[in-house]
UniProtKB/Swiss-Prot annotation:
Protein name: APC/C-CDH1 modulator 1
Region (Disordered): 1-38
Induction or repression: Expressed very quickly after G1 release, just prior to initiation of DNA replication.
Source superkingdom: Eukaryota
Function of the molecule: Negative regulator of GDH1, the activator protein that regulates the ubiquitin ligase activity and substrate specificity of the anaphase promoting complex/cyclosome (APC/C), and which is required for exit from mitosis, cytokinesis and formation of prereplicative complexes in G1.
Modified residues (Phosphothreonine): 161
Protein encoded by which gene: ACM1
GO process terms (BP): cell division; negative regulation of protein ubiquitination
Keyword set includes Transcription: yes
Record keywords: Cell cycle, Cell division, Mitosis, Phosphoprotein, Repressor, Transcription, Transcription regulation
Length: 209
């Protein structure tokens, strides 16, 4: 079906001197004039109630005068705060000991004393002062570790393997008494000196037959 033909005007040039038609607006879309707004504002101000403020003849404020007792309390409180602040170490005070300061700068007199040979030589710890204990997990019995070893090594029979712990094996040897006179024969670890402490063996030591 062929659509009805619609008449269209031929495109022509537009006259630039022709003014466009002014858009006519209705009265309901017009904004009120400035004069009308000013009249409404003046009318509202004249008709609005105005609150009357009565000026009081009494004094609006009173000067505060500090008494002698209040002055003494204030001075005493100020002195307490000042003394508390002075008692706290000031981190900006150069005379205070700093946390990361070198020990040589903190105690120069003690360092000079160490240079003069005032240090104490190292020695073995006392067994009586530094005691050790072991506890039986079944009976909860606490046994002190007071089993020391002497200067001589303990001779073990050939059928007994010496302890593999390097801290304990230095006190035992597999050589016979005649081959090494510095050793001593022991049937247990109970007959040892009281200078050093080691763990007590759980077996008895017998000589070769």
């Amino acid at each position: 079906m062929i659509s009805p033909s619609k008449k269209r005007t031929i495109l022509s040039s537009k006259n630039i001197n022709q003014k466009p038609r002014a858009v006519v607006k209705g009265n309901e879309l017009r904004s009120p004039s400035k004069r009308r707004s000013q009249i409404d504002t003046d009318y509202a101000l004249r008709r609005s109630p105005i609150k009357t403020i009565q000026i009081s003849k009494a004094a609006q404020f009173m000067l505060y005068e500090e008494t002698a007792e209040e002055r003494n309390i204030a001075v005493h409180r100020h002195n307490e705060i000042y003394n508390n602040n002075n008692s706290v170490s000031n981190e900006n005070n150069p005379s205070q000991v700093k946390e990361n300061l070198s020990p040589a700068k903190i105690c120069p007199y003690e360092r000079a004393f160490l240079r003069e040979g005032g240090r104490i030589a190292l020695k073995d710890l006392s067994v009586d002062e530094f005691k050790g204990y072991i506890q039986d997990p079944l009976t909860d019995e606490t046994i002190p570790l007071t089993l020391p070893l002497g200067d001589k090594k303990i001779s073990l029979p050939s059928f007994i393997t010496p302890p593999r712990n390097s801290k304990i094996s230095i006190f035992f040897t597999s050589k016979h008494q005649g081959q090494n006179p510095e050793t001593k024969i022991s049937r247990s670890t109970d007959d040892v000196s009281e200078k050093k402490v080691v763990r007590k063996l759980s077996f008895h030591v017998y000589e070769d037959e």
